[in-house]
Regions:
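Nucleic-acid nuclease catalytic cores
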Residues: 117-160
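Intrinsic disorder/low-complexity segments
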Residues: 1-43
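Conserved catalytic cores of phosphodiester-cleaving nucleases, focusing on short active-site segments
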Residues: 60, 83, 104-120, 133
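A short, surface-exposed helix-loop junction/capping segment
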Residues: 48-58
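A short acidic/basic microdomain associated with nuclease active sites
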Residues: 77-93
Length: 160
């Protein structure tokens, strides 16, 4: 089997899995529940990654960050995955005092922060920004996605 046919077969299999798992429960519905979060967050990240690749293939590089952010929001929402664009999260001191608010690019399914970039390369400040968002919000999982280069860059970060 050629590499291209193998990729198409894998994509078809992923699409089928997204529609239904073995129990007949829709994957999207399953992702929205909080039972098995470790497996579900990985599936959610896979969906966001695959969707990002599709967007990058279609739009390529050269657009503003906002365009990629909107495209990702649109496509994930079409799949039934809740996404909040430019979501504000509170930052609190150890005694609970509000220190202010921060704004994440995308907050996906109430458990994944996605920081979108459209630059030549990811730099330490971009990573620090996402890690700061994760720490401040106490969300464990984040994706840093850069649409700005010739090749799409996606990096997952997990806070323990």
């Amino acid at each position: 089997m050629s590499h291209e046919k193998a990729q198409k077969a894998q994509k078809l299999e992923r699409d089928k899995e997204m529609e239904r798992d073995n129990n007949g429960t829709g994957l999207i519905e399953k992702l929205l529940r909080t039972d098995d979060q470790s497996e579900d967050i990985n599936k959610l990240c896979d969906i966001v990654r695959e969707t990002s690749f599709q967007i990058h293939k279609f739009l390529r590089s050269g657009h503003l960050e906002k365009i990629y952010e909107s495209a990702l929001t649109h496509r994930l929402t079409k799949m039934g995955i809740p996404v909040i664009q430019q979501h504000e999260l509170g930052v609190f001191d150890e005694d609970g005092t509000s220190l202010g608010r921060l704004c994440v690019d995308l907050f996906v399914a109430n458990r994944l922060i996605v920081e979108v970039k459209a630059c030549r390369a990811v730099v330490d400040e971009h990573i620090a920004q996402l890690l700061g968002y994760l720490r401040a919000s106490r969300i464990e999982h984040g994706l840093l996605i850069n649409f700005g280069g010739q090749r799409l860059q996606i990096k997952k970060y997990i806070l323990n």
